Design a protein with these regions (language model features):
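A short beta-strand motif characteristic of beta-propeller blades
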Residues: 64-70, 117-122, 185-191, 236-242, ...
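An edge-strand/N-cap motif at the start of beta-rich repeat modules
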Residues: 31-56
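Short glycine/acidic-enriched loop and turn motifs that connect beta-strands
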Residues: 45-48, 92-98, 147-150, 217-219, ...
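Short loop/turn segments immediately following beta-strands, especially the blade-tip
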Residues: 54-61, 107-114, 153-164, 223-232, ...
């Protein structure tokens, strides 16, 4: 062992500076751990290896510290349970755990670091689950299986795990038109009008009624929901036709006014607004507009929706056109185009607004990145802030509630 010697003045000064710097860095890390929060990103295999946890800086919206937290197969879709204590992940496959369906995995979330603890796994009751969401009271999980065209309901147990399916409905009917009638000139957007393909399922804010879209049948199904039994029963009428032949209804969102539903049609690249009857639980079409610029010609597939908290601004992602189209939402569900923004990536599969609405993220599946935009608080217009997060085939993003 070398004999210890007193440090020189320069060395002592360096050690003191190092101690101060280290303390500052430690303080900054501590501040970041309390002021930042987490989000989860689902991906497609093979570029994406599973579910990733990222740290979100609430001031800048920057994403960092990408960590693989789950390696379940093809976890393209995910959702938080009510309260943000659990995460549910859909494996978009047809052979989950050696079976013939997809699967849903339930996780408990550690709020301190966003780590996941698996609770259980269930068969999704169909092939290729592409959407899942909790009922407003947090007691049931709704799942849409795209490949098989079925929808299912699962009870959520007290610990957040999933029980056996309480209701399974197989959507049936003649396939929709192969070519969308409302598509722009030069569009070759034709896909999957060969049978039922459930693309989304969600309830109204009251939890009394449920709607599911079927891209293959060009229908929007209307269900009544019994909270005691967790069962779906057809409403009257049980479904309504899409706004145009071959439109391919994909995703929808309820407006904060509680009376309006905004829906995106994938194949036609159009948006449709509906009046929601709160008493009957049915929809009536109001308006329909193109999600693409008036002068665009060619193929594009509309995908994800994001609605501002106040309901004034709707954003829709256009794949192949690789844009985010912005619309104002007026009285009576009227939609007017405001602006379009390049996604800075390829094939935006979904959009996500930060919890405070200050940032919007585009999940670009084919360019393997997530891009970040600031949202103008006055007019909702987007500005690219130079943020690229490299991640393989990102599909969907869910934010943990910010720390209180």
């Amino acid at each position: 062992m070398r004999n210890w010697q007193a440090p020189t003045r320069r060395a002592a000064l360096f050690l003191a500076l190092l101690a101060v710097t280290g303390s500052a860095l430690h303080a900054e890390d501590a501040m970041n751990s309390t002021s930042s929060h987490f989000a989860y990103i689902g991906t497609y295999n093979p570029n994406g290896e599973g579910v990733y946890r990222v740290r979100v800086d609430p001031a800048s919206g920057a994403l960092s510290q990408v960590t693989l937290v789950s390696k379940v197969p093809n976890p393209a879709q995910l959702t938080l349970g009510v309260g943000g204590k659990t995460l549910y992940v859909a494996s978009e496959v047809a052979d989950f755990n050696g079976g013939k369906h997809g699967g849903i995995t339930a996780y408990r979330i550690n709020p301190a670091d966003g780590a996941l603890t698996q609770l259980n796994q269930v068969d999704s009751q169909g092939a290729g689950p592409v959407y899942l969401t909790s009922m407003p009271d947090g007691r049931h999980l709704l799942v849409a299986n795209y490949v098989s065209g079925s929808v299912a309901v699962f009870p959520i147990e007290a610990d957040g795990s999933l029980g056996a399916a309480s209701s399974v409905q197989q959507q049936q009917g003649p396939a929709g038109a192969a070519k969308p009638a409302a598509a722009v000139n030069g569009s070759f957007a034709v896909s999957d009008h060969n049978g039922p393909h459930a693309h989304m399922i969600a309830s109204d804010p009251s939890g009394k009624f449920v709607f599911s879209t079927d891209l293959g049948l060009d229908r929007i199904y209307q269900w009544r929901f019994d909270a005691a039994s967790g069962r779906l029963t057809p409403n009257d009428p049980p479904w309504i036709a899409a706004s145009s032949a071959g439109a391919g209804p994909r995703h929808f969102v309820f407006h904060p006014d509680g009376d309006t539903v905004l829906l995106v049609n994938e194949e036609a690249s159009t948006l449709t607004s509906y009046r929601f009857d709160r008493q009957k639980g049915t929809l009536k079409q109001l308006h329909a507009v193109s999600a693409l610029p008036a002068d665009y010609q060619g193929t594009s597939f509309a995908s994800g929706l994001a609605l501002s908290k106040n309901g004034d601004t709707l954003y829709v992602a256009n794949r192949l056109h690789n844009s985010i189209a912005q619309f104002s939402v007026g009285a009576g569900g009227e939609l007017k185009p405001v602006a379009e923004t390049w996604t800075r990536g390829d094939y935006p599969r979904s959009l996500a607004l930060s919890p405070d609405g200050r940032y919007l993220y585009a999940l670009n599946q084919r360019s393997d990145n997530v891009t970040r935009f600031s949202v103008n608080p006055t007019d909702g217009k987007l500005s690219f802030v130079g943020g690229y997060l490299p991640i393989g085939s990102p599909s969907q993003m869910a934010f943990l509630p910010p720390p209180k």
